Amino acid sequence: GAIRTNKQLKALIKEELKNRNGLIGSSEELLLNAEGESKLALDNSEQGKIIAGKQAVIHTAAFDNNSGSIDADSLELSADSVNNAGGAIRVNQQLKAQINRNLNNQNG
């Protein structure tokens, strides 16, 4: 599936977002649970794509980017754990990441 907009995309999701082999994109800012502490489990695996023309802000408890990708002009990523095995996180400008527990970047 695909969720796309030419404007800002802001989503507040309580528990789980599955974007396996899907696309979430914005020509402007992309904000996923960008306010406060998040318990979100974000699954962007299996060729999932998150694309932001400007800034992407992602606050999540668990982020699975196994064989997935994030492309953004700048990225603020906050998570307890990140699985980026075989995945790609590509940022043109500033990357700010806070990983509280585990980061797997094997073949990433």
Give residue spans per PLM region:
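Extracellular beta-strand scaffolds
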Residues: 1-4, 9-11, 15-19, 23-25, ...
